[in-house]
Amino acid sequence: MRARSLAALILSCLALGLAAAPAGAEEGRLPAPPDLPVRGVWMHPGLFGPVKADAVEKMRTVLDEYARAGINTLIMLVKNTSGHVYYASEIGVPDPAYGWDFFGTFLAEARKRGMEVHPWFCVFPESAILGQVRQHPEWLISSPKREMVAAVNPALPAVRAYEIGLMLEVVRKYDVGWVHLDYVRYPCEPAEPFFGFDAETLRLFKEDTGVDMATVKARDTGNPVWNVWLRWNTGRVTVFVRELKAALAGTGRKVRISAAVFPDAVNARVMIGQDWAAWGREGLVDMLNPMIYTNDARLFETLVREAVACGGSRTIVCPGIGIGTSHNQNTPGGMLEQMRLSRTLEAGGVVFFSASSLAPPFLEALKTRQ
């Protein structure tokens, strides 16, 4: 969903076909007004650019427009899939194009308008292999053929500590009440998930299960041992979320967790080790944002209903509505229909992907439907 370097691979795993605009959402015939508590948008620093004076001017213009459209939640990227960060960091590597504290400046402008800000982390991708990741190549996922993947391995405690350290740094430097997780999963590939087959991961797996994965030849779901391997790796991602929750609690502040997740909980658990249904049941996250990027109203409704059930009473669900994505190109009417469905299904709100696609016709539709 984010940087192009990994997007093609990830999006190939989940082909939600384009469909015609949903019934009842034709242009000129808009659905009933939505009334949702959370009206959010995913945002990238590139929308504003690296020149501070120009960026600040555009921030003010865009956020004023958003306020008029009833947008109250901003999910702003602070770590991209290359590993660069957009805040004043002593741990991570700032994007060299931004020689100033982009996030701090943006946060101040959002606060003036009473908007909630979620610093958004693309957690495990590290495509540029920067900083500490460059110093620790053993952190990268290694395939059975010893091919390196441009993402770090959630199974390794040092990796989890590094990524959590970045999040704690933001929480300690800035007055934020949320941390937003994206790419909190393994890389996906249609034939086989890219779990780590490095020596340390295999040692940890054997220590926990007694199984020497290096001796397993039949790597398919017909093999019970392979299923143990899938479950164990999925569990490492959940361990990360659990460790993050504990670390945030240790700051002495109330900092909540939101997470962008794949739209189907069952497939996500098996294909990418992202058991977000369990996170909802356990209350490990406070908000789930399943990315349901489709124009098919019935499919959208089905997936939102399933997601809300996963959230239960402990986690609010605010589905991601695709405005302009690789999966769909929405319309203002289609957007409003999906908002209406979300409200009917008792979702806690919606989040739009993304700011770069939220053109004036969409904002005008939001202004008239508050």
Where are these regions (language model features)?
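Aromatic-lined substrate-binding rim segments of carbohydrate-active enzymes
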Residues: 63, 80-122, 232-251
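The substrate-binding groove and active-site-proximal loops of carbohydrate-active enzymes
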Residues: 44-53, 88-100, 147-161, 225-237, ...
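Bacterial N-terminal signal peptides
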Residues: 8-19
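Substrate-binding cleft of secreted/luminal carbohydrate-active enzymes
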Residues: 284-302, 307, 315-370
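Acidic-and-aromatic substrate-binding clefts and catalytic sites of carbohydrate-active enzymes
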Residues: 48-57, 79-84, 96-98, 126, ...
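Active-site-adjacent "subsite" loops/lids of carbohydrate-active enzymes
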Residues: 33-56, 118-174
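Polysaccharide-binding and catalytic clefts of secreted carbohydrate-active enzymes
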Residues: 65, 145-282
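Catalytic domains of carbohydrate-active enzymes, especially glycoside hydrolases
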Residues: 57-83, 173-177, 285-287, 347-349
